[in-house]
């Protein structure tokens, strides 16, 4: 089974290609955990689809609201979201920087080939961790040892701190020299490293969700066409960016469990199960059209 599999496509933002959006721009005020972001329609539609799913899990009829605002001459649209503001700010800043470079015809890494459908590609890799602490079984009663809520909270804090310190992106794949070169994990790492990642890269942002045993990590990188080290002289060689285009506005996910973590508390060893979900998506800047669907 591939380490990255295609996710079910969930249309998030409605786009009406027949509507005229010229004139005074409508500002979208997004209240995200008490932090307010002001965005334009293009800024919002330019975000990766997987991030839009996190911001608006029930969908967003954006274009209908824009039309209503223009008809009633209201300048603002108000929306709310439950997503870490620091992660969103990092994503917005990165995309704004890439947009500015694209507008000024600045190529940060390497120019795209003629067959690429835009001026710049941005790879999003996101990891969502949820961890569970399992008390050991008492050898005398054959029943799980009881843990007080206060001790369980301290255990979760320790596990969270340990996971937060594990910043290397690919360490969780447990790749060894003995791992087969044809394994799904090594193929994934090879594809990403042929596109701009490095094997020792760290997550750019890694945070714990408040009051939850969850950790979210995000890394963005520009698609580097010159990093493709495949046999380009082979006429049948399939460039890596063609494979990544399969994830353009179609995020792919892979979920797996990791039981390699344990923690000792008051002389007792507790097993920790970690559920990881990776999301991979490609965003294309300078594309001719937005391929968004109506809810």
UniProtKB/Swiss-Prot annotation:
Location of the protein in the cell: Cytoplasm; Nucleus
Keyword set, alphabetical order: Cytoplasm, Nucleus
MF annotations from Gene Ontology: RNA binding
Record's GO cellular component terms: catalytic step 2 spliceosome; cytosol; nucleus
Name the InterPro entries on file: SKP1/BTB/POZ_sf (IPR011333)
Q: Which residues form the signal peptide?
A: none
Q: Name one GO biological process term.
A: mRNA cis splicing, via spliceosome
Protein origin, superkingdom: Eukaryota
Q: Which family does it belong to?
A: Belongs to the WHI2 family.
What is the name listed in the Swiss-Prot or TrEMBL entry for this protein? WHI2-like protein P4H10.16c
């Amino acid at each position: 089974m591939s380490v990255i599999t295609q996710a079910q496509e969930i249309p998030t933002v409605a786009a009406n290609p027949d509507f005229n959006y010229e004139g005074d721009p409508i500002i979208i005020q997004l209240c995200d955990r008490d932090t307010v972001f002001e965005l334009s329609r293009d800024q919002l539609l330019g975000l990766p689809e997987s991030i839009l799913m996190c911001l608006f899990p029930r969908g967003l009829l954006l274009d209908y609201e824009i039309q209503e605002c223009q008809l009633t001459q209201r300048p603002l649209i108000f929306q709310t979201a439950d997503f870490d503001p620091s992660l969103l700010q990092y994503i917005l800043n990165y995309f704004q920087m890439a947009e500015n470079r694209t507008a000024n015809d600045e190529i940060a890494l390497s120019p795209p080939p003629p067959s690429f459908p835009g001026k710049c590609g941005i790879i999003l890799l996101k990891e969502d961790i949820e961890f569970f602490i399992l008390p050991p079984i008492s050898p005398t009663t054959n029943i799980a040892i009881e843990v007080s809520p206060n001790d369980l909270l301290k255990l979760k804090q320790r596990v969270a701190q340990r996971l937060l310190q594990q910043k290397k992106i690919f360490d969780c794949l447990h790749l060894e020299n003995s791992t087969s070169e044809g394994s799904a994990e090594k193929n994934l790492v090879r594809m990403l490293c042929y596109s701009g990642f490095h094997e020792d890269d760290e997550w750019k942002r890694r945070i714990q969700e408040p009051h939850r045993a969850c950790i979210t990590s995000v890394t963005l990188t520009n698609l580097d066409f010159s990093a493709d080290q495949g046999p380009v002289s082979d006429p049948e060689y399939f460039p890596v960016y063609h494979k990544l285009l399969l994830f353009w506005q179609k995020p792919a996910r892979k979920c797996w469990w990791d039981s390699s973590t344990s923690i000792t508390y008051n002389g007792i060893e507790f097993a920790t199960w970690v559920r990881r979900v990776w999301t991979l998506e490609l965003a294309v800047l300078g594309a001719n059209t937005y391929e968004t669907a109506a809810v």
